[in-house]
């Protein structure tokens, strides 16, 4: 498993903080945004990260010397200053278990705990599309979130799914919204407020300033407006879900 760590992100929406990219092999097949051609492939997929410069960078991770092995990446995270804000995975997901071919949607618990331990005392956050119907996946995410230093958000693709994942009680939740969704007043079917990503709605806002996705015990769902090359197609799919 290879990971690339950029110490100062050049993405204005993220801000000048460390950001990582994990090779596409980490993405679970349960991710509904994945291309039929596989993770990291732009053809027919809806994942914003598969397109443009980020997509080109992502597809090179683990090739031609780009990125480092997981253990070296974790050592680099451990060396970050105390309270350092950082984003894990502008593309990619949690490390995947390869103990059995049937386990392709099961996270690698050992590697996940290695990361959460390395991030102790930091202010990291990430997102996962792994299937939370798996008891192991739920247990790993819950334990990762018990460690002070890395917040794992569960990614949902409808407001009703956001409710379901929030009710698990193991992690904060984010949801993908159609690109033309209102910026205020959205609630889930169970009444949870949805805060549309401030970096998408405010010109002077970035992840480095907002930090909302890093808050573990928040009551709100963070909503991300569909964006990127496939946003129109993805928005059409999302509009029919709730």
Task: Write out the residue ranges for each language-model feature.
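Class I S-adenosyl-L-methionine
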Residues: 1-242
């Amino acid at each position: 498993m290879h990971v690339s760590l950029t110490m100062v992100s050049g993405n204005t929406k993220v801000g000048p903080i460390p950001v990582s990219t994990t090779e596409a092999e980490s993405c679970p097949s349960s991710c509904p945004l994945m291309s039929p051609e596989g993770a990291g492939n732009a053809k027919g997929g809806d994942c914003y990260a598969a397109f443009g410069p980020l997509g080109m960078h992502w597809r090179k991770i683990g090739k031609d010397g780009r990125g480092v092995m997981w253990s070296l990446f974790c050592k680099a995270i451990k060396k970050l200053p105390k309270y350092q804000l950082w984003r894990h995975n502008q593309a990619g997901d949690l490390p995947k278990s390869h103990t059995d071919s049937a386990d392709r949607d099961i996270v690698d618990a050992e590697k996940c705990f290695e990361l959460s331990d390395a991030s102790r005392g930091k202010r990291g956050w990430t997102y996962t599309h792994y299937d939370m119907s798996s008891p192991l996946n739920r247990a790993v995410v819950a334990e990762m979130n018990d460690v002070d230093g890395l917040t794992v958000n569960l990614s949902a693709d409808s407001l009703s799914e956001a409710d379901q994942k929030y009710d698990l009680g193991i992690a904060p939740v984010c949801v993908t919204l159609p690109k033309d969704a209102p910026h205020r007043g959205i609630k889930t079917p169970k009444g949870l407020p949805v805060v549309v990503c401030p970096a998408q709605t405010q010109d002077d806002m970035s992840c480095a300033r907002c930090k909302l996705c890093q808050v573990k015990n928040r009551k709100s769902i963070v909503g991300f407006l569909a964006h990127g090359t496939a946003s129109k197609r993805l928005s059409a799919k999302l509009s029919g879900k709730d």
